[in-house]
Amino acid sequence: MPQSPRSAPGLLLLQALVSLVSLALVAPARLQPALWPFPRSVQMFPRLLYISAEDFSIDHSPNSTAGPSCSLLQEAFRRYYNYVFGFYKRHHGPARFRAEPQLQKLLVSITLESECESFPSLSSDETYSLLVQEPVAVLKANSVWGALRGLETFSQLVYQDSFGTFTINESSIADSPRFPHRGILIDTSRHFLPVKTILKTLDAMAFNKFNVLHWHIVDDQSFPYQSTTFPELSNKGSYSLSHVYTPNDVRMVLEYARLRGIRVIPEFDTPGHTQSWGKGQKNLLTPCYNQKTKTQVFGPVDPTVNTTYAFFNTFFKEISSVFPDQFIHLGGDEVEFQCWASNPNIQGFMKRKGFGSDFRRLESFYIKKILEIISSLKKNSIVWQEVFDDKVELQPGTVVEVWKSEHYSYELKQVTGSGFPAILSAPWYLDLISYGQDWKNYYKVEPLNFEGSEKQKQLVIGGEACLWGEFVDATNLTPRLWPRASAVGERLWSPKTVTDLENAYKRLAVHRCRMVSRGIAAQPLYTGYCNYENKI
């Protein structure tokens, strides 16, 4: 039958469309995806694979030591499918065409003990490898913790164009963190943070491969932790009875963090920063004197009476059972000695002990007893640097957190030279805000830039970005943290050689938009826009 003249243009149009599709299949690939933090080894290949939201799946490899019974991975598979495709599957019909080559599946293989039911620890293995090739990508990890990090990397490799088409480069990635301790400090005493805000922070931490939530849960201002052993601590020490973290709240935070490979380390700072404790626990704090007259003012914890240590023995026994991590942060910073000096009972105790007028020896006496309590509970301790500076007799393995910005490199040298593990937070106090792109200052920090042997540098187990809460609550915590903390995240994860600021800016700008698309209200780096700003 002769071809109708009216059908010829339609045929030409179809041929043109086929040609365009063919061109698309051989178009130059994106060889620089915005991976954050940047992996240890990345090989990107020019070949693009197309991904269909309707056909793609994330599954367990048949030879994996984890399987469908591993709820941690099952939940992660669902979560990362949604991160990659968003609401595409619910709001779009079938794909307009099936382009080839295509990636059909991501198989996840755990090669050693899966640790599906465990909580992460300082020694958790976060190593993974990722091979993306047609038709199946393979993610291998020794444990679920590495698999979680690899899933995040995979999700960052997938690109959606303006037509809604999903693609990924064939690639090979081998990755592991530079430091095992990569933390974010939140402060829930100066301002109470609702549980949903903490959970949102844990999500953002996972997007940036942080693995420690340092929960500075109580301080002078309020005591929101609801103790089952000493309920009056929060009944009288919290801002209000609705500004507390119940046992169920704490369990929710712990499990939410576990599912994202994040440890939760609680901090109960003593003997200073304890005004809220005294409201619910009589005779715990030191009465201050004006000459020989007792005032209504109280100072640090009273270190001279046995009831103090009996209380803390019981209290920390509860804490050690509630929080599964091997570490408890004991604080020990900024202890004011004036009240101790004014109290005649303290003066008499120091005289009997032969301490003279050196209140650092009294502080050391107290801290040593608290460290012994923690050790008796089969836990390890973290302390702020003043505890080390004031010559407290520390137990082997006590971790010292270096937070004072002056001469922190020298402090790291001293701490590690004495054989103690160290955490660096001094250059990463994110509550100190300034105009402009201050993330660059955080990014340029080199944690191991101090004089010391290789053995000393191996004692630096990582660092933390700290966001103290004097001027931060649920309304501004997220944009103040992100993406500024992302700079710290890359410094603690990526190899030492990853330092190119221009490249980092390009990747971080995309990563910031990616966080916005996932519901994280991360503030902008500079001028520009995101395609997903309506998601916030």
UniProtKB/Swiss-Prot annotation:
Protein's gene: Hexb
Keywords associated with the record: Cytoplasmic vesicle, Disulfide bond, Glycoprotein, Glycosidase, Hydrolase, Lipid metabolism, Lysosome, Signal
Signal peptide as annotated in the record: 1-31
Subcellular location: Lysosome; Cytoplasmic vesicle, Secretory vesicle, Cortical granule
Reaction catalysed by this enzyme: Hydrolysis of terminal non-reducing N-acetyl-D-hexosamine residues in N-acetyl-beta-D-hexosaminides; N-acetyl-beta-D-galactosaminyl-(1->4)-beta-D-3-sulfogalactosyl-(1->4)-beta-D-glucosyl-(1<->1')-ceramide + H2O = a beta-D-3-sulfogalactosyl-(1->4)-beta-D-glucosyl-(1<->1')-ceramide + N-acetyl-beta-D-galactosamine; a ganglioside GM2 (d18:1(4E)) + H2O = a ganglioside GM3 (d18:1(4E)) + N-acetyl-beta-D-galactosamine; a ganglioside GM2 + H2O = a ganglioside GM3 + N-acetyl-beta-D-galactosamine
Top-level taxonomic group: Eukaryota
Function recorded in the entry: Hydrolyzes the non-reducing end N-acetyl-D-hexosamine and/or sulfated N-acetyl-D-hexosamine of glycoconjugates, such as the oligosaccharide moieties from proteins and neutral glycolipids, or from certain mucopolysaccharides. The isozyme B does not hydrolyze each of these substrates, however hydrolyzes efficiently neutral oligosaccharide. Only the isozyme A is responsible for the degradation of GM2 gangliosides in the presence of GM2A. During fertilization is responsible, at least in part, for the zona block to polyspermy.
Biological process terms in GO annotation: astrocyte cell migration; chondroitin sulfate proteoglycan catabolic process; dermatan sulfate proteoglycan catabolic process; ganglioside catabolic process; glycosaminoglycan metabolic process; glycosphingolipid metabolic process; hyaluronan catabolic process; intracellular calcium ion homeostasis
Known glycosylation sites: N63, N169, N306
EC top class, as a word: hydrolase
Record's protein name: Beta-hexosaminidase subunit beta
Active site: E334
Organism lineage string: Eukaryota, Metazoa, Chordata, Craniata, Vertebrata
Family: Belongs to the glycosyl hydrolase 20 family.
Subunit and partners: There are 3 forms of beta-hexosaminidase: hexosaminidase A is a heterodimer composed of one subunit alpha and one subunit beta (chain A and B); hexosaminidase B is a homodimer of two beta subunits (two chains A and B); hexosaminidase S is a homodimer of two alpha subunits. The composition of the dimer (isozyme A versus isozyme S) has a significant effect on the substrate specificity of the alpha subunit active site.
Record EC number: 3.2.1.52
